[in-house]
Amino acid sequence: MSPASEFAARFIGSYNLLSKEQASAIFDVQDKGLYAVRPESIYVQEEGGIYPGTCSSPVQGTVVSHQLLGNVIRYRIAALGTELTVDVMNRSSSRLYAPQTAVRLLFNLAEIKPLAH
């Protein structure tokens, strides 16, 4: 289910909302307004990782915090002039990045949704 508006994106769940300026750092923006990105549609790039062919070029970020939620690690990562929520599978302690760690993010472009303005 994709949100149709900013209100719906905030109501439905933990979507990251990107402005046109923030989104243009990731892909060629066609619309004005906001873009919604689910936390699981953003990947922390790992050496040797395999990612969908629809991913963006890497975007630099810095880990602000992390929260262990069972089989998911929820990160707050500063990137693109905002703090993004990024969810990754908790497969091992080696995947746990400490605050202030520099990371590279990949956005699944097929899952970035423009919102009605």
Regions found by a protein language model. Name each.
Residues 1-12:
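Conserved beta-strand-loop-alpha-helix hinge in the C-terminal portion
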